């Protein structure tokens, strides 16, 4: 089963085993990870599941959709090249070991 490591702004790390097909946001909520609010429940409508995905992981996910791109413009924490909505990131064996950094704030 793939693992995802969530890194808080203070450097605290939480490693979670995630079944393939589950979204990075769902895994965080299920594991009780603070820092993912997910107000819209994963519909890409609120930008409160914003995370930073660094290389080489960023290239293993589909490109940002127009909808996700628009929502990322409304994040509370600064948008960077690494910004993604975790509700749009589906875990697969290709991303085993994925590291996502959580922003300072979501709302």
From Swiss-Prot:
Note on cofactor: Binds 1 [2Fe-2S] cluster.
Domain named 2Fe-2S ferredoxin-type: residues: 2-106
One Pfam family linked to the record: Fer2
Gene Ontology CC terms, in alphabetical order: cytosol
Obligatory cofactor(s): [2Fe-2S] cluster
PROSITE patterns tied to this protein: 2FE2S_FER_2, ADX
Keyword Plastid included in the entry's annotation: no
Keywords: 2Fe-2S, Electron transport, Iron, Iron-sulfur, Metal-binding, Transport
Binding-site residues for [2Fe-2S] cluster, renumbered to this chain: 40, 46, 49, 87
Disulfide bond positions: none
UniProt xrefs under InterPro entries: 2Fe-2S_ferredoxin-like_sf (IPR036010), 2Fe-2S_ferredoxin-type (IPR001041), Adrenodoxin-like (IPR001055), Adrenodoxin_Fe-S_BS (IPR018298), Beta-grasp_dom_sf (IPR012675)
CDD domains: fer2
GO molecular-function term, one example from the UniProt record: metal ion binding
Coiled-coil ranges from the UniProt annotation: none
Gene3D superfamilies per record: 3.10.20.30
Swiss-Prot/TrEMBL GO biological process terms: P450-containing electron transport chain
Similarity-based family: Belongs to the adrenodoxin/putidaredoxin family.
Function of the protein: Ferredoxin-type protein which transfers electrons from rhodocoxin reductase to cytochrome CYP116 (ThcB), which is involved in the degradation of thiocarbamate herbicides.
Protein name: Rhodocoxin
Provenance organism: Rhodococcus erythropolis
């Amino acid at each position: 089963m793939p693992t995802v490591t969530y890194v808080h702004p203070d450097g605290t790390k939480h490693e979670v085993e995630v079944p393939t097909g589950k979204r990075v946001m769902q895994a965080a909520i299920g594991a009780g990870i603070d820092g993912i609010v997910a107000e819209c429940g994963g519909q890409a409508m609120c930008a409160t599941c914003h995370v930073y995905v660094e290389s080489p992981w960023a290239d293993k996910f589909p490109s940002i959709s127009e909808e996700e791109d628009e929502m990322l413009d409304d994040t509370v924490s600064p948008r960077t090249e690494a910004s993604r909505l975790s509700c749009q990131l589906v875990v697969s064996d290709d991303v085993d070991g994925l590291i996502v950094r959580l922003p300072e704030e979501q709302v």
